[in-house]
């Protein structure tokens, strides 16, 4: 039986505490990512580290998969440390990539993507938290779509080595944006549901809140990333 499949209905205490912890850790992770990115920019280290962007990508995937696979065995401090390590690695990636976009398209495009991502994420999370509809089936569809997106993206990466396909890339970005907006909605509903049922069961509750914080963190980060790609593509076509 998985960590999410257990029966939490015996205790409905402190739902606000659980939700606050999820969004608190998500915010902390975003702050760590932002500070790491700013540090790379301020020191100029992003120029040296730019060629290693793929290392940060694979490292974040590795940390994420490890947390998911070992969550029941890891201690709470270990999960906290891995969450913060993940945030730093994302900061390394964005700290090397965002300055390139700012230099090519202007800093305004970065702020536009950031502001739009914040608004879209906030509205999506609010809808998910307050809607009465059961989004369980939609979550399954979105996860299948996410797998499809990963396969398509890898295929595009290979093909683009031989021929540029800007329109295809733009379509992939829009698809990714839609998927992660949808995941934000369903994950927000999951947070509300678990918050109402899990109560405060010590380590289990804290681990669940950290996992959900990581999910929401990834959602907002990917919304920002796809918006940045879309805005950059639009700027190129002018």
UniProtKB/Swiss-Prot annotation:
Its main location: membrane. It comes from Chlamydia muridarum (strain MoPn / Nigg). The keyword Nucleus does not apply. CDD domains: BI-1-like_bacterial. It comes from the Bacteria. This is Uncharacterized protein TC_0206. GO terms for cellular component: plasma membrane. It holds the Pfam family Bax1-I. The chain crosses the membrane at residues 22-42, 49-69, 78-98, 105-125, 141-161, 166-186, 208-228. It is a multi-pass membrane protein. It is found in: Cell membrane. Belongs to the BI1 family. The keyword Transmembrane applies. Keywords: Cell membrane, Membrane, Transmembrane, Transmembrane helix.
């Amino acid at each position: 039986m998985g960590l999410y499949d257990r029966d939490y209905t015996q205790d409905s205490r402190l739902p606000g505490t659980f939700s606050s912890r999820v969004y608190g850790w998500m915010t902390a992770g975003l702050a760590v990512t932002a500070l790491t990115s700013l540090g790379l920019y301020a020191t100029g280290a992003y120029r040296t580290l730019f060629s290693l962007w793929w290392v940060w990508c694979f490292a974040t995937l590795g940390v994420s998969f490890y947390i998911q696979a070992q969550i029941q065995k890891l201690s709470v401090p270990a999960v906290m440390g891995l969450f913060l390590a993940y945030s730093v690695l994302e900061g390394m990636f964005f700290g090397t990539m965002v300055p390139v976009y700012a230099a090519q398209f202007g800093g305004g495009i970065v702020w536009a993507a950031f502001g739009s991502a914040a608004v879209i994420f906030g509205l999506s999370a609010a809808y998910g938290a307050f809607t009465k509809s059961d989004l369980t089936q939609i979550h399954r569809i979105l996860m299948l779509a996410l797998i499809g997106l990963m396969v398509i993206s890898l295929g595009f990466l290979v093909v683009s080595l031989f021929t540029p396909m800007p329109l295809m890339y733009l379509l992939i970005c829009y698809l990714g944006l839609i998927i992660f907006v949808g995941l934000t909605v369903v994950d927000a509903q999951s947070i509300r549901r678990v918050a109402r049922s899990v109560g405060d069961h010590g380590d289990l509750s804290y681990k669940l809140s950290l996992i959900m914080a990581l999910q929401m963190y990834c959602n907002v980060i990917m919304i920002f990333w796809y918006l940045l790609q879309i805005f950059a593509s639009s700027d190129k076509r002018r």
